Structure formats: structure tokens, C-alpha cells
A protein has these predicted regions:
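Short beta-strand/loop motif that positions the catalytic acidic residue
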Residues: 199, 205-207
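Catalytic histidine-centered segment of alpha/beta-hydrolase-like enzymes
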Residues: 235-247
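Flexible "cap/lid" loop of the alpha/beta hydrolase fold
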Residues: 113-156
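Conserved HGGG/HGGXW glycine-rich cap/lid loop of the alpha/beta-hydrolase fold
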Residues: 19-74
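Short beta-strand immediately N-terminal to the catalytic nucleophile in serine-hydrolase-like folds
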Residues: 105-107, 131
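Conserved loop-alpha-helix segment in the C-terminal half of the alpha/beta-hydrolase fold
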Residues: 207-235
Length: 256
């Protein structure tokens, strides 16, 4: 992908364990950290379909990391680089690196779960966005972990048109490294209902109407102290293509 006004070049910061992790920025104004989903990257999730531009145009500095194992970030194969909650720790390292104190935070799918884990661990953004995520995907990560392990260990064997086949096709589109993704799955951490109930950050729960990959978004909104549900068209893969995704995030962040 060539650098252009809509494809900003990556910057890099060091993780706590010394890896070089990439992030991109668009816009000026209030900082918003947006985290992408599994097999994706910051460009694909947030820039490619115009979401980052819509939000930046509303007066935000949109900061989009590539998770370890993804995009232009380091992608080690050694399982020791993927301890529990490492993605939340990386998010915290980025916030420290940029010196952010008053900011907003969100993500899609795995990025939404990572945002939630950061909240549990003490992050205090003004507002949070949990998109492409439901209650089951927060309480019990094992189901999705098992699905993606099946995808990664069966590459080239999945039935055409199946969910696993489509996930593999997406991985190939983004150039993901299966040998880095596999140990990353073991870093997923479950969150309890009690932990959810203690979160008082206003949170947008944003999900496609046909997306039940991670369980019920409505139940996730109910489980949070200040969860606000918004549904848009699409399923887990196609909701990202909808302009309503970026517009809904913008509207939530700019509301009084």
C-alpha cells in the first residue's frame, strides 16, 4: 500500500517486551485510539473504508495501531511473546508512549475485546467503543479461540463458502502470518460479569444486526454500567464496509 493522504505512513513504538509495534495517525484534535480485529490491521479496519477520515474530519486525532502479529508490527512465532492480556498491555504502552491522558478508546471485534480488557485493567478514557463484540465473546473467549485455531491449523482444507474458509480468505487478503496468529490466540483472557459491572465509562456497543459471532451485543450493553447499543446493517464481516460504522462512532464521540 503506497503512502498517500489516505494511507499515512506507520510510526513505531516499543512494547514492554521490546517489540517494534506500528501505528498510524489521521487528523488533528482530540485523541482517539482505535484497535482493529483479528487477522486485520489498522489500515484495513479503519482507513480503507473511510471510517478514520469521517472521524478525523469531526476534529479527532485518530490513532490506529497494528496489533502484535499483524500488519507492520513485529510478528514473532515464539509463544513467550504472547502471554495473557498482552494486547491490552500493548495498548497501555501506546497510550504511555504518546503521553495520552484525556482521550477516547475503541476497537472492532478483537479490538473491542482489547479495549474492554484495558478498561478492566484501569484505563480511563472519556468514552469507549466496543464494536463487533457481544457478551459471550467477553465472558468466554474459548469458543472464538477454538474457531480461529481451526481456521489456522486447517489452511487449504476448509469447505468453500464456510465461515472458516471466509476467515482464511480474509487472512490471505491482509497478508497475515498464521504462525504468529496461533500463539496469539492463547493470550485471550475472559472477563467476569462482576468486572463488567464495575466499568462506568460510557461505552458505545456497535454491532451489525446480523452479527452474532461474539454473542449478543444487546446483552453486553446491559452488562455494562453505561452501555449504549447501536445496530447497523451487516454481519461480522460486512458491517465494517458500512459507512454507518464510522458515522456512528463519530456521533457517539461528539454527542453532548
Amino acid at each position: 500500500m503506497a503512502s498517500s493522504p489516505t494511507d499515512p505512513p506507520p510510526n513505531f513504538f516499543k512494547s514492554a517486551d521490546g517489540l517494534d509495534l506500528a501505528y498510524r495517525e489521521m487528523g488533528e484534535g482530540r485523541p482517539l485510539v482505535l484497535i482493529h480485529g483479528l487477522f486485520s490491521n489498522g489500515w484495513t479496519n479503519w482507513i480503507r473504508y473511510g471510517h478514520a477520515q469521517v472521524i478525523a474530519d469531526a476534529g479527532f486525532r485518530v490513532i490506529m495501531p497494528d496489533l502484535r502479529g499483524h500488519g507492520q508490527s513485529a510478528a514473532p512465532h515464539d509463544p513467550s511473546f504472547y502471554p495473557p492480556d498482552v494486547l491490552a498491555a500493548d495498548g497501555e504502552a501506546l497510550v504511555r508512549h504518546l503521553g495520552l491522558t484525556d482521550y477516547d478508546l475503541g476497537g472492532y471485534s478483537l479490538g473491542g475485546r482489547t479495549t474492554l480488557r484495558m478498561l478492566v485493567r484501569g484505563a480511563r478514557p472519556r468514552r469507549a467503543i466496543l464494536s463487533g463484540m457481544g457478551l459471550e465473546g467477553i465472558l468466554h473467549t474459548g469458543k472464538r479461540q477454538g474457531f480461529f485455531r481451526h481456521v489456522l491449523t486447517g489452511i487449504g482444507t476448509h469447505q468453500r463458502g464456510s465461515g472458516a474458509w471466509m476467515a482464511e480468505a480474509f487472512l490471505k487478503t491482509t497478508g497475515g502470518d498464521p504462525q504468529a496468529m496461533l500463539p496469539l490466540l492463547d493470550s485471550f483472557v475472559d472477563t467476569s460479569r462482576d468486572e463488567l459491572a464495575k466499568i462506568d465509562t460510557p461505552a458505545l456497543i456497535l454491532c451489525g444486526r446480523d452479527d452474532d459471532d461474539n454473542g449478543s451485543a444487546a446483552l453486553l450493553a446491559e452488562a455494562l454500567g453505561e452501555g449504549h447499543l447501536v445496530e447497523i446493517a451487516g454481519n461480522h464481516m460486512t458491517a465494517v464496509l458500512q459507512s454507518a460504522l464510522g458515522q456512528s462512532i463519530r456521533d457517539f464521540l461528539t454527542a453532548e
